[in-house]
Amino acid sequence: VSMQFNSIIMGLAGGERIFKLLDETPEVDDGYVTLVNAVKEGDTIKESGKRTGMWAWKHYHKDTGVTDYRELKGDVVFDDVDFGYNPDKIVLHNIKMFAEPGQKIAFVGSTGAGKTTITNLINRFYDIQDGKIRYDGININKIKKDDLRKSLGIVLQDTHLFTGTVMENIRYGKLDATDEEVYAAAKLANADSFITKLSDGYNTMLTGDGANLSQGQRQLLAIARAAIADPPVLILDEATSSIDTRTEKMVQDGMDKLMHGRTTFVIAHRLSTVKNSDCIMVLEQGRIIERGTHEQLLELKGKYYQLYTGNAMAQ
């Protein structure tokens, strides 16, 4: 009887969460700029009905009836951005930064410094209180949220896999992908070598959020999933902080190949993974207190030097 009672309680709790989700108010989205596949003919950008490897922002001007296109390059700018989960309590202050197309920008700092919050603003999980965030010169408030997020590839520390085959989990990044595209993405992510050793290879069934795989293997699948989506901008949120050093190298190699040619924002506790970044932003209490390359920040002998060397006496 007690077991049945516990099952009933668990069912009621689950039902309560489902009904709470159904009662949620849909997100307000005032965006009107959309993301489309495009081709370039001379100096003219045109919309394409099929995947071309080139993306463009489609801007329809209601006042003139004219539609223009702007190539998606991956230029991201934060201009004096303030943000607080509660408007009365600002947690990010005067954030200024720019990422040029193809650059790797790393955020480092203590827990709670604001690293993940910044990346959550890029994909508009939250809206800012002050300032502007521009994507290829377009205020992100003008971009439809679904299209904005479609342009971003996200690899998180906690990888979520669903019940299905390995191939289906990778293909989730691009539902119409061919088998050959899945194989290519897995090879780029360094996942092919372990997948082919599984009992049924790419047809191996995964259950329980991939419980039969190691943390490193799950992350390799997440990289493959991002690779097949072919996003122009990447967000890697502490993606190697939960695996052993040996596996980390394989994951990092896969990430390096994925990052090639893409604007990338990286958050990591292991500073060795961000040494080759074009710019490292050091955050403390919601402010950028240092910025520069690995070598430049070590020369400063400030907060980054302290984090990197473990020297608590660094000023």
Task: Annotate the PLM regions.
Residues 38-315:
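ABC-type nucleotide-binding domain
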Residues 24-27, 200:
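Flexible, glycine-biased helix-capping/connector loops in cytosolic signal-transduction modules
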